[in-house]
Amino acid sequence: MIKHDSIRLLATNLLKDAIGRAYPDFSASEDDIYKALVNPPKSDLGDLAFGCFILAKALKTAPPQVATAVAAQMKGATAVAAGPYINIRFDEQTHGEQVLATILDGSYFKKPLMEKSPKTMIEYSQPNTHKELHVGHMRNLCLGDAIVRMLRYSGREIVSSTFPGDMGTHVAKCLWYMKKHNQEPVPETEKGEWLGRMYSKANLLLEDQNGTPQEDINRQELTAILHQLEGKTGPYYDLWLETREWSIELMKKVYAWADVTFDEWYFESEMDSPSAAWVKQLYAEGKLEMSQGAIGKDLESEKLGFCMLLKSDGTGLYATKDLLLAKHKFEDVKIEKSVYVVDMRQALHFKQVFRVLEILGFEQAKNCFHLQYNYVELPDGAMSSRKGNIVPLRELVHRMEDHVKTTYLSRYKGEWSEEDVEKIAGQVAKGAIFYGMLRMDTNKKIVFDMNEWLKLDGESGPFVQYSYARISSLGRKFPRTAGAKIDWSRLNHASERQLMQSLGGFNTAVAAAAENFKPSAICTYLYDLAKSFNVFYHECPIGTEADVATREARLALSEAVGLTLKNGLAVLGMPAPEKM
């Protein structure tokens, strides 16, 4: 195992030596000791706690007795036996040399955190073309991007991919409305957003005509459009080619704003015809069944229903394309694991897809994983592009930027350049959105509330960003003396020790979050670190501190917190404003 935590490793070595002195005939495993070290329930008990249970079992001695014997032999740290545990505390100088110094020189953030792992593809952000991108799409984008960043930070080999839906009924509806009913001229700009409005209007019209003779006509017209798209010919196909580019341009603008890039772009249109042909081949080989004119796989015996792959009219479905794409990912990109970041409403879909792949003999099916998450709602309920009750993303960003400029940055008018105001407003808005989308556990629903997410005094992105900006401002106002040796022993205030303990746990927090696909854990870590810094900032004077050595040590501690906040924000895909 990789032992990246220097304080934990030091404790491991000291414990191993102490165990050897207490029990000369017994040799303890370094890995077992390292893994048994935990954070005590209260920070004032110590930096780490070692449970003696496994050791006691091997020695056939009561755990409290082992704890007392080993603690008595500990050197290089303060060790206190507390029942079956040994609470271990290091002095400030050790913390400074082992943790703070490595944070300040940057080496702390370059340590590999995980053993060699399988080459993994993370597929996320699968927006549909011909629909408007809205705030509901952001949970997927933020979650997928954070997972990619966390895993890469930890040392994993990751391939990021996206799979936009540029085919299907939603596209046919939009094109149908444009050709047959739209009276508006196509705008010169923001064509992608305009397409989304066309899609919503199409749905409203179709719903109005349900139950009338026009309903069957509409259905036939939509089917004919889909056949044109699949056949790659006809006026609707030509219109699709043009309008598809408008949507892709909008996606790329959003990704540029979010600072998200993908190693691989897949499109449903690329999988459409080949996947349908493959399904027909599998049916001809007797590997699939027909039910009521549709081709698929009967999974009723496994309580997964009938996995439909070709409808009775010959058109494919999402599952059809996902089957073929899974093969492409493993065979063409040579990945060893495939993760799909898709909301929980698609749980049955992926269970069916993975099971069908397995039945078809695709061995890598066992290495496919659906990372599901709950969806985003507005305070008054769920969003729907079909109904048009959404908050368009670009409109939301502009509103949030205006709020930041009016509420927080207006005081700097005349002092800051317009360029700086715009830049920082954008960074804070982005931080609010990303943190708000990531701070909740993936199984919990998110209710989007712009005002709450933009608060500077709550659990929010702007609060963490503001803490970083405050530290940056402090460093500019009171720069540390270049080359001066820092006396870490000066950091003996309770709030200073709390910060040092927290800083040493950053890599451990990221490694655990990456392993469990839970960026919410990093949000919690950063929020707690920012809170601890603000306590320290108010309790321990810096600029007015008369003792030079103490001031230098506190400035170094502040800088270490700032670097950790900055790296933590980066792991979550969030910017760190230098001033706010």
Swiss-Prot record:
Xref: Pfam families: Arg_tRNA_synt_N, DALR_1, tRNA-synt_1d
Name listed for the protein in its UniProt record: Arginine--tRNA ligase
Biological-process GO terms, alphabetical: arginyl-tRNA aminoacylation
Keyword terms of this UniProt record: Aminoacyl-tRNA synthetase, ATP-binding, Cytoplasm, Ligase, Nucleotide-binding, Protein biosynthesis
Motif 'HIGH' region mapped to chain: 127-137
InterPro entries for this protein: Arg-tRNA-ligase, Arg-tRNA-synth_N, Arg-tRNA-synth_N_sf, ArgRS_core, DALR_anticod-bd, Rossmann-like_a/b/a_fold, tRNAsynth_Ia_anticodon-bd
Cross-referenced PANTHER family: ARGININE--TRNA LIGASE, CYTOPLASMIC (PTHR11956:SF5), ARGINYL-TRNA SYNTHETASE (PTHR11956)
Assembly mode: Monomer.
Any Gene Ontology CC annotation: cytoplasm
GO MF entry, a single one: ATP binding
Coiled-coil features, chain-numbered ranges: none
Gene name of the record: argS
Enzyme Commission designation: 6.1.1.19
Subcellular location: Cytoplasm
Enzyme class: ligase
Catalytic activity field: tRNA(Arg) + L-arginine + ATP = L-arginyl-tRNA(Arg) + AMP + diphosphate
HAMAP family linked to this entry: Arg_tRNA_synth (MF_00123)
Keyword Protein biosynthesis included in the entry's annotation: yes
Organism: Bdellovibrio bacteriovorus (strain ATCC 15356 / DSM 50701 / NCIMB 9529 / HD100)
